Design a protein with these regions (language model features):
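Charged/polar, solvent-exposed surface patches and flexible loops
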Residues: 26, 69, 90, 94, ...
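Low-complexity, flexible helical/coil segments
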Residues: 38-44, 74-80, 114-118, 136-143, ...
Length: 229
């Protein structure tokens, strides 16, 4: 069995953050996964994640414990950093997770061939987006950010996240006009599934090749959205 989830946004100051964490932990603990099964977390599990040399975020400690329990049972856990938690450098791998980097990545598991990524950069050629992405991925900028005290760094980042969400609001999927849809159509025809997050709106469309394009919903306002192969 292969299970996918994304966009939990642990720590997001909207609604009830503690309830959201409990809901996600309950879902993880209820998964009927065993040795040889796989769990793919496709980004933005945390609303903000940044690793210092000796410090990691406190939000989602019970989530980490639940993931460790799954790995102790022999479940393979894969993590694709999103645009909110891209600064996960080494700690998840030290815990035993598989970091998906670079993205997208193609897997062939249990007889199914699929491409996964968070989805924020695929097919997007807007100059403003590419500029901001280069800054976020810059080793120099990351080193500068690391000089900030965590209290200042996390306060700034969470306010940025809140403001960005209020500015952009709810996203409306544009179907065949979407750059991500067009990107998936341009990929090899033997890929059976394209599975992404990021857009915060559920999508399940069949491409001209017969492949399925799956966009995972977010966990912000309730439910336990996921996809299973």
């Amino acid at each position: 069995m292969i299970v996918f989830a994304s966009d939990v946004h642990l720590g997001l100051r909207k609604g009830d953050p503690a309830e959201r964490e409990r809901r996600f932990v309950g879902w993880l603990r209820g998964l009927s996964l065993s040795k040889g099964d796989s769990l793919f977390l496709l980004g933005d599990i945390w609303d903000f994640w940044y690793e210092y040399k000796y410090v990691v975020p406190k939000d989602g400690v019970r989530v980490i414990a639940a993931l460790l329990d799954l790995m102790d049972r022999g479940v393979e856990v894969y993590f694709a950093p999103g645009n909110h938690d891209l600064w996960c450098f080494h700690w998840f791998e030290e815990l035993g997770m598989h970091k998906i980097d670079p993205q997208p990545a193609v897997f062939n598991l249990e007889g199914k061939k699929f491409m996964v990524a968070h989805g924020d950069g695929l097919g997007n050629d807007k100059k403003s987006f590419l500029f901001l992405r280069r800054i976020f991925h810059s080793k120099f900028c990351q080193a500068l950010f690391s000089t900030l005290h965590p209290r200042l760094a996390f306060g700034f980042a969470l306010r940025w996240s809140d403001g960005n969400r209020r500015t952009h609001g709810h996203y409306v999927w544009k179907g065949k006009q979407e750059r991500l849809y067009q990107y998936a159509c341009s990929q090899p025809s033997d890929i059976e599934y394209f599975i992404f997050g990021h857009f915060h709106t559920p999508v399940d469309e069949t491409l001209p090749s017969g492949a399925r394009l799956i966009i995972l919903d977010d966990w912000i306002d309730g439910g336990t959205p996921s996809f299973t192969l």
